[in-house]
Curated annotation (Swiss-Prot):
Protein name listed in UniProt: Actin-related protein 6
Matches recorded under PANTHER family: ACTIN
Cellular component GO terms held in the UniProt record: cytoplasm; cytoskeleton; Swr1 complex
GO molecular function, one term: nucleosome binding
Major localisation: cytoplasm
Lineage: Eukaryota, Fungi, Dikarya, Ascomycota, Pezizomycotina
Pfam families: Actin (PF00022)
Regions of compositional bias (Basic residues) in chain numbering: 1-11
Superkingdom: Eukaryota
Assembly information from the UniProt record: Component of the SWR1 chromatin remodeling complex.
Underlying gene: arp-6
InterPro entries: Actin, ATPase_NBD
Length: 446
């Protein structure tokens, strides 16, 4: 186009690129959030409860406000994420608004000058993805945006450092890893090759932290006190006392009570397994306390002697709950356990990838913090593959924030600028074009 005097008129410059990136690992239990820019990073994310909670006095807590709660008894939750996917945007927006856009927000940002990198779980429904994209651009107006698979972002961490063989550049995707993510809603197995997820081989187990907490609640309510209205307290108890058994049958034998009228010595002594858990009283003690097993406490309770403390003695409850990850059929779930899922996943990829995948198994998510989890998983996987296969299972130092740290590294990589979508592109091409671009995933050749 020419103006007066024949001079060419330059096309209007597009909007300036965003100066900072907000990385959100939007989990069902917690949001991991932090800012990343070219010259600095938050280092570690802020962990925010992803829920709306109401106490028995009908006071409402939104997101991080839950930290102010002192009485966790009969706490009721409303969560925007179910089965790993955002299904309640009304609740999710209320949490995001308070945490990132309110004037008093600890991590306040201007979306018009911010790029958003958001995690999602594998195999999300296209309708949920499109709704998410619309909220990001039309409701909030972020300058640019990328929505990627949470497990895959872990490929942008220095995964080999866990195995004591660090790679030279931590922001390049790992060559090949098998990522097991066991979180609040479910457990997924994702093979990753050079930053690309191998979609046909992704497997999912519908056992996560929520189901295990519910199972522990049921056991306690049948054997001890009615805990059906105490999800927060039971979840704390699960995280404090449960462990993954390395000898399930042996531990079960040690905690067996014995025949009627004759209690076994192992049962009476606790066999090194039984623990006492002192419940919070909401006055002087706001969180439960784990103690070594004291047989006298149980005896006094049976005799009806009044105590100032409510104490639960946990025996096989400590290990039968995490066992669901390996044997979900114990409670009637017709799905294979984690080790069998790994085998199913590898059967869906070329056998030439097996050595690399089996030698680089990385576990993340809160359930991987269970004592003995990695050792048990490695043992179970070894049973399912030939003896010549080398199996290594490792867990990052903090598996809960591992996905966020990987996404923060990705934000500085050239792949991010290539795969992101700007608000202008969204307005020009529409949601379907955005969905196709995001479906390409990570690790494309530049």
């Amino acid at each position: 186009m020419t103006g007066r005097g024949g001079a060419k008129k330059s096309r209007a410059a597009g909007p300036a690129p965003p100066t900072t990136t907000l990385v959100l690992d939007n989990g069902a239990d917690t949001i991991k959030a932090g800012f990343v820019s070219d010259d600095k990073s938050d280092g570690k994310p802020r962990i925010i409860p992803n829920c709306l909670a109401r106490d028995r006095h009908r006071k409402i807590y939104v997101g991080s406000e839950l930290e102010k709660c002192k009485d966790f008894s009969e706490l009721a939750f409303r969560r925007p994420v179910e089965k790993g996917f955002i299904v309640n945007w009304e609740a999710q927006k209320e949490i995001w608004d308070r945490e990132f856009f309110d004037d008093k927000a600890a991590q306040k940002c201007d979306p018009s000058d911010t790029r958003l990198i958001l995690t999602e779980q594998p195999n999300s429904l296209p309708s949920l993805q499109t709704h998410c994209d619309q909220i990001v651009f039309e409701e909030y107006g972020f300058a640019s945006y990328y929505r990627g698979l949470g497990p895959v972002f872990n490929a942008y961490r220095d995964i080999q450092s866990i195995f004591r063989t660090p790679q030279s550049t931590i922001d390049s995707p790992a060559q090949v890893i098998l990522l097991i993510d066991s979180g609040y809603s479910h457990t997924t197995v994702t093979p990753i090759l050079q930053g690309r997820p191998l979609h046909p081989a992704i497997r999912r187990l519908d056992v996560g932290g929520k189901l295990m907490t519910n199972y522990l609640t049921r056991l306690l309510s049948v054997r001890h006190f009615d805990m059906r209205n105490e999800p927060y307290i039971v979840n704390e108890m699960k995280e404090a006392v449960c462990y993954t058994s390395l000898d399930f049958k042996g531990d079960l034998e040690k905690t067996w009570k014995g025949t009627r009228g004759e209690k076994r010595e192992d049962y009476l002594s606790g066999a090194g397994i039984a623990k006492d858990y002192v419940l919070p009283d909401s006055h002087t003690r706001f969180h439960g306390v784990v103690r070594d097993y004291e047989p006298g406490v149980s005896a006094r309770a049976r005799k009806g002697i009044v105590s100032t403390e409510d104490v639960l003695t946990l025996r096989n409850e400590r290990f039968v709950v995490p066992e669901l990850l390996f044997n979900p059929s114990d409670i009637g779930i017709r799905q294979p356990g984690i080790a069998d899922l790994v085998k199913q996943s590898l059967l869906a990829v070329p056998i030439g990838l097996w050595p690399g995948l089996l030698a680089n198994i990385v576990v993340v998510g809160g359930n991987s913090l269970s004592e003995g989890f990695c050792q048990r998983l490695q043992t179970e996987i070894l049973k399912r593959f030939p003896d010549e296969c080398r199996v290594r299972v490792a867990r990052p130092e903090d598996p809960i924030i591992s996905t966020w740290l990987g996404a923060a590294n990705f934000a500085k990589h050239e792949h991010a600028s290539k795969l992101e979508v700007t608000k202008q592109e969204y307005e020009e091409h529409g949601a379907a074009w955005v969905a196709r671009k995001f479906a390409a995933g990570l690790g494309l050749d530049p």
